[in-house]
């Protein structure tokens, strides 16, 4: 198991793990019969089959029978991929189509991941937190509870350039659209990061920051809290 606390260990894992190109291959044949093996699955009968597995394993078999195959069609969405996508079927969270979530990501109860979001290896999405459309959480980036990561916002990861400390976003933080949180930054509980801000240093709890580089413009008050409150109906699956 890879040590997610070390950027170099993650990079080494990506380098050394067997790369895969998962595919679905549709095959028509007039004379052959195919069955599943320990390398791939086969569905179908009577000359029409669907293979599911790694491209190299499947083609090794099909190439041997090329003269007896009348037609093929290959569907794929990656090539030589090091890290598979996370199996999210058991997650008690709302995950919308088009989100890309890699393996070894933690998704806590009632989290929301919207269309087009990208979540890298080792990231953590806390309970009730929302990752909005096209937002990015880099490797080991961590959101606490009830965080809103705005559309197009970026939480930098620990890979390239390597960083010993991941971005930590504490509970009840709102990060506006297209904001960028750079490597190693910690955003304190209840803080607000304005849209488009570039955060290069830690933000204290309850602060409101804006600009590039982001600066504290005020402390969170009742008016700001009302403008940035979350909607529970978007999160609760019970």
Curated annotation (Swiss-Prot):
The keyword Amino-acid biosynthesis applies. SUPFAM superfamilies: Trimeric LpxA-like enzymes. It catalyses: (S)-2,3,4,5-tetrahydrodipicolinate + acetyl-CoA + H2O = L-2-acetamido-6-oxoheptanedioate + CoA. One of its GO terms (biological process) is diaminopimelate biosynthetic process. Pathway: Amino-acid biosynthesis; L-lysine biosynthesis via DAP pathway; LL-2,6-diaminopimelate from (S)-tetrahydrodipicolinate (acetylase route): step 1/3. It holds the Pfam family Hexapep_2. Keywords: Acyltransferase, Amino-acid biosynthesis, Diaminopimelate biosynthesis, Lysine biosynthesis, Repeat, Transferase. GO terms for molecular function: tetrahydrodipicolinate N-acetyltransferase activity. Its EC number is 2.3.1.89. InterPro entries: DapH, DapH_N, Hexapep, Hexapep_transf_CS, Trans_hexapeptide_repeat, Trimer_LpxA-like_sf. Belongs to the transferase hexapeptide repeat family. DapH subfamily. PANTHER family: 2,3,4,5-TETRAHYDROPYRIDINE-2,6-DICARBOXYLATE N-ACETYLTRANSFERASE, ACETYLTRANSFERASE. Catalyzes the transfer of an acetyl group from acetyl-CoA to tetrahydrodipicolinate. This is 2,3,4,5-tetrahydropyridine-2,6-dicarboxylate N-acetyltransferase. It comes from Clostridioides difficile (strain 630) (Peptoclostridium difficile).
């Amino acid at each position: 198991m890879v040590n997610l606390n070390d950027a170099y260990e993650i990079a080494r894992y990506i380098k050394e793990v067997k790369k895969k190109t998962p595919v679905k291959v549709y095959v028509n044949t007039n004379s052959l019969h195919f069955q599943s093996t320990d390398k791939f699955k086969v569905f179908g009968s009577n000359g029409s089959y669907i293979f599911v597995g790694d491209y190299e394993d499947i083609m090794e078999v099909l190439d041997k029978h090329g003269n007896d195959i009348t037609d093929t069609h290959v569907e794929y969405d990656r090539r030589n991929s090091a890290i598979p996508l996370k199996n999210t079927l058991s997650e008690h969270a709302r995950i919308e189509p088009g989100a890309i979530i890699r393996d070894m990501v933690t998704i806590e109860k009632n989290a929301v991941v919207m269309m087009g979001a990208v979540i890298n290896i080792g990231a953590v999405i806390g309970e009730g937190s929302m990752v909005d459309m096209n937002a990015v959480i880099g490797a080991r980036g961590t959101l606490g509870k009830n965080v809103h990561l705005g559309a197009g916002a970026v939480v930098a990861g620990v890979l390239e350039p390597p960083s010993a400390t991941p971005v930590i976003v504490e509970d009840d933080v709102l990060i506006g659209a297209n904001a960028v949180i750079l490597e190693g930054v910690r955003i304190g509980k209840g803080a607000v990061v304005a849209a488009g801000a570039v955060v290069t240093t830690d933000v204290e709890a309850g602060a409101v920051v804006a600009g590039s580089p982001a600066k504290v413009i005020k402390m969170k008050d009742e008016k700001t809290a009302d403008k940035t409150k979350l909607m529970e109906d978007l999160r609760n699956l019970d």
